[in-house]
């Protein structure tokens, strides 16, 4: 795939969704001759070549929501590559060699803030040049994190994201339950029907996820400004940085099916541009329900959800650590729902949050069972 530092960074900002149809104005460029030849024998592949990875409809939509009438110009200046242009992008120049694309074909684009890198235990580093060090993959330094259990067992991206599922516009070929049908109710967390029926598996089993709170774009005009911001990543005329990055269990909300699922900023975008008289202007404050590829057998304890209003963007003001308004930002808190929205779902209704925090006798019993299981595992074992 075509990729430059500028285009990779901008794609990372503009979207990670595999959902969304392209409108007439988002028609892709003509296919390369080699891909036209492929389609003669593989006509179903047209679903990929006309899908979101090729049309970039989600990225264009984000740019238009953030920049309004100037959205298309932002997209044209800053997001010019790292999308499927033809069959060779994933299958290489020898598609009949009998080898399906490996993880490296996916992570050329699904890296950084994209879901994909996290599967292999990689998280994006801070944007400043001083942090661009350490291990490198796909030409970019990364933080070493805990990989997904499935990756440790040798599974590749293509084991779940098959060619047919991509052709049909589906995110995956199988659900978790199709591979793991026998869920033990003896596990305390599984004893509650609501946990199995109203939550995605990732809500509990995703160990961590990259999160960026406050994405900043600066349009440096003068030579002095350009020098000052030169250590930051360049996106066309912009330089990019972040207020805060975290790699822990992500917040929770509701996905498009109404299930409790991980959510994260995508993005809370501020822009400074002297030519427009913008200073930390809030362009958009969007969150997205997503599927962290960081699955582990264990989960957080009960109190990490049931006694954590911040995780549901209901942070009490008395517990607030970051005073954004004192920093000159037009937003009360990243963990307050004011001025923010979930583009493919919603925040958990406050009455449901209140109900889930009632300490019923069954909740107390299962909470004690959970702690007892943890203590039993930690206890010394004889004969080992």
Question: Which sequence ranges carry the predicted segments?
Answer:
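A general, composition-driven signal for non-globular sequence regions
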Residues: 6, 39, 77-80, 199, ...
């Amino acid at each position: 795939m075509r990729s430059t530092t500028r285009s990779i960074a901008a794609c990372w900002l503009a979207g990670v969704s595999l959902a969304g149809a392209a409108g007439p104005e988002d028609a892709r460029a003509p296919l390369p001759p080699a891909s036209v030849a492929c389609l003669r024998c593989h006509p179903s592949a047209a679903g990929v070549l006309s899908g979101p990875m090729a049309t970039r409809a989600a990225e264009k939509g984000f740019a238009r929501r953030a920049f309004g009438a100037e959205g298309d110009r932002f997209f044209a200046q800053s997001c010019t590559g790292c999308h499927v242009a033809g069959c060779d992008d994933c299958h290489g120049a020898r598609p009949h060699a009998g080898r399906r694309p490996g993880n490296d074909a996916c992570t050329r684009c699904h890296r950084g803030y994209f879901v994909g890198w996290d599967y292999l235990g990689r998280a994006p580093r801070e944007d400043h040049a001083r942090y661009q060090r350490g291990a490198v993959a796909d030409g970019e330094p990364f933080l070493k994190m805990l990989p997904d259990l499935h990756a440790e067992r040798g599974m590749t991206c293509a084991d779940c994201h098959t060619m047919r599922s991509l052709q049909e516009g589906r995110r995956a070929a199988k659900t978790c339950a199709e591979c793991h049908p026998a869920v033990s109710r003896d596990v305390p967390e599984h004893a509650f029907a609501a946990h199995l029926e109203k939550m995605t598996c990732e809500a509990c089993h995703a160990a961590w996820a990259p999160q960026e709170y406050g994405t900043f774009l600066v349009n440096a005009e003068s030579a002095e400004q350009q020098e000052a911001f030169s250590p930051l990543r360049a996106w066309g005329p912009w330089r990019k940085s972040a207020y805060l990055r975290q790699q822990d269990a992500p917040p929770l909300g509701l996905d498009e099916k109404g299930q409790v699922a991980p959510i994260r900023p995508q993005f809370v975008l501020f822009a400074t541009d002297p030519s427009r008289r913008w200073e930390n202007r809030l362009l958009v404050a969007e969150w997205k329900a997503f599927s962290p590829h960081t699955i582990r057998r264990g989960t957080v304890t009960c109190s990490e959800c049931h006694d954590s209003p911040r995780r549901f963007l209901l942070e009490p003001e008395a517990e607030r650590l970051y005073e954004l308004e004192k920093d000159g930002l037009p937003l009360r808190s990243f963990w307050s729902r004011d001025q923010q929205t979930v583009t493919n779902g919603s925040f958990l209704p406050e009455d449901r949050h209140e109900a889930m925090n009632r300490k019923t006798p069954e909740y107390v019993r299962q909470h004690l069972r959970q702690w007892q299981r943890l203590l039993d595992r930690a206890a010394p074992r004889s004969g080992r």
